[in-house]
Amino acid sequence: MSIDNSKTRVVVGMSGGVDSSVTALLLKEQGYDVIGIFMKNWDDTDENGFCTATEDYKDVAAVADQIGIPYYSVNFEKEYWDRVFEYFLAEYRAGRTPNPDVMCNKEIKFKAFLDYAMNLGADYVATGHYAQVTRDEDGTVHMLRGADNGKDQTYFLSQLSQEQLQKTMFPLGHLQKPQVREIAERAGLATAKKKDSTGICFIGEKNFKEFLGQYLPAQPGRMMTVDGRDMGEHTGLMYYTIGQRGGLGIGGQIGGDNEPWFVVGKDLSKNILYVGQGFYHESLMSTSLQASQVHFTRDMPEEFTLECTAKFRYRQPDSQVTVKVKGDKAEVIFAEPQRAITPGQAVVFYDGQECLGGGMIDMAYKDGEACQYI
């Protein structure tokens, strides 16, 4: 007996890309009552009057017409500015390196958009993320990595709550990216050959330094080695991230070993950028971190200890860790020293294939001593 999905309404977040296009197509083919929604989160009109969002919405319209679903555009620019972009700027002001994608999923795609979809009578929202959800008999939802390891996006979805996941579908989670392209091409979708978007949505193809400089005044200062040698001037602490190699302008001229130079720390109060030679410079290595905004996708006790694996950045192999949780804070102790743990980035916890949740990195430590001098 086939399941009748026609009474289940799914509102799909459509970006004008191939992933969300195939998401809508698959749900339509499975018989769901599908509505496509294009989210306009940022005014990206350039000096020539060209707006990427306008072009993307045309692609959404073309695909929606092809597969026969209604579609609308909704403007979340204010919500995005207040909840994501202000956070992004505040983190850079504090000398950290934020991850706006994590916050965008938490606050916009699975909060503002989810609320909007529910007002349209949705039973679920769906997106083109590469992640999977499974449901226990009691209704508890588990979020699993996407089947395509190279595309898995659970790192960016790690702040989603059980309530958000209850209302979410990820139709691409079991597919490999080439299969998604193939489905789009077979169906003749207008977006089948469209390039994937990369980078932060509100920066796009713009020069990052120039973009950030429009909102935060750059404050040049001294570049120093950890042992106090003056290495010249930096252009502003916000432009550098822990472990960064390029853009320092100092080559391998001092130290004799000709190894490349890396950013190893920042002192916000003195406006000093610390640099050191060698990929595994001792100041880049740490044995634990402190995280805040720690959150799990399922109900957990207020205080507990967890043995699991973790990622400290996207596209990184898992590392074995011990997590000591107290409220929304955690100490994460590494089984092996880790390189370039970066304040502002997400730390995400896994149990095998399941993403358990995560938090935001506040500080890295080496044998109890703070590493980055922020």
From Swiss-Prot:
The record marks H129, Q345 as: Interaction with tRNA. InterPro entries: MnmA-like, MnmA-like_C, MnmA-like_central, MnmA-like_central_sf, Rossmann-like_a/b/a_fold. Its EC number is 2.8.1.13. GO terms for biological process: tRNA wobble position uridine thiolation. One of its GO terms (cellular component) is cytoplasm. Residues 99-101 are annotated as: Interaction with target base in tRNA. Residues 151-153, 313-314 are annotated as: Interaction with tRNA. It is found in: Cytoplasm. It holds the Pfam family tRNA_Me_trans_M. Gene3D superfamilies: Adenine nucleotide alpha hydrolases-like domains, HUPs, Translation factors. Catalyzes the 2-thiolation of uridine at the wobble position (U34) of tRNA, leading to the formation of s(2)U34. This is tRNA-specific 2-thiouridylase MnmA.
